[in-house]
Amino acid sequence: MATEHLPAERAQSPLSAPQRVEEPQKPNYALRLTLAGHSAAISSVKFSPNGEWLASSAADALIIIWGAYDGKCKKTLYGHSLEISDVAWSSDSSRLVSASDDKTLKLWDVRSGKCLKTLKGHSDFVFCCDFNPPSNLIVSGSFDESVKIWEVKTGKCLKTLSAHSDPISAVHFHCNGSLIVSGSYDGLCRIWDAASGQCLRTLADEGNPPVSFVKFSPNGKYILTATLDSTLKLWDYSRGRCLKTYTGHKNEKYCIFASFSVTGRKWVVSGSEDNMVYIWNLQTKEIVQRLQGHTDVVISAACHPTENIIASAALENDKTIKIWSSDY
């Protein structure tokens, strides 16, 4: 146990209250597990909302379900004919949706590993997907430049939004389900009313670099965007203002997933094209840790819902998932 040495004149008497130990200003993420199972570049990793599982998708057209704590392969989901770009969990952790270059989305029952429905309607690669919080709707984004909203129960497309003028890179539902955010290679980030399909706001940067990732913050007040000029930004979208900018990583080519870490202190986490995971202090914007170990571009970084655990995944010269954990 570390002892704090105080100058003599400030030493506490035995009767005074003990000093509060300050939480460390930086995390100490260390590698715990390396998961190998995919035979091609991994595209996405996501923890289940209940924290038990990790789903990964890859260019081998497979989804693998892993134990989040033991790293064991629990299930492999077969069905897509071409590479998968994204996967997302339902709120009760019982179902998954996947987005594929075969122009379809598939809805899966996790326990049985069976495909429940195939959602057809996009005319080009489906690149990104998400469930709304009640998990009765799915949103998808495609290289056909549209965003589609699907009904889970029937598998029908309820709405098609002519969202952007270039491929859609990311879609995400707000925590109350009322809004959808989309990002595109056209350099725009758009916020949509999920019920009406109306565009409520457009966020754009000077120079309009391609938007490679977007996500609402867990409290729903902010949006995190990534652009292909190696920049992450935190937006107060209700005012259309950029509040924070995070730099130091490399992101010029790939749509790399980023995440908010809120289980300990508040960090922003992202993969990088220099084969590392970057962690920033959300408030101060300083890089607090870089995680080394992958041997190719880290395409995806996901944070566990309740523990200080990060999963990262890399492209074809690596093909592994790494699980990292921190004491705080």
From Swiss-Prot:
GO terms for molecular function: histone binding. GO terms for cellular component: Set1C/COMPASS complex. It comes from Rattus norvegicus (Rat). The keyword Repressor does not apply. Residues 1-23 are annotated as: Disordered. It holds the Pfam family Beta-prop_WDR5. Probable part of a cullin-RING E3 protein ligase complex containing CUL4B-DDB1 and a substrate-recruiting component (DCAF). Interacts with CUL4B and DDB1. This is WD repeat-containing protein 5B. Keywords: Repeat, Ubl conjugation pathway, WD repeat. Coiled coil: none annotated. A motif (DDB1-binding motif) lies at residues 186-190. Belongs to the WD repeat WDR5/wds family. It comes from the Eukaryota. InterPro entries: G-protein_beta_WD-40_rep, WD40/YVTN_repeat-like_dom_sf, WD40_repeat_CS, WD40_repeat_dom_sf, WD40_rpt. WD repeats lie at residues 37-76, 79-120, 122-162, 163-202, 206-247, 250-290, 293-328. May function as a substrate receptor for CUL4-DDB1 ubiquitin E3 ligase complex. The keyword Transcription does not apply.
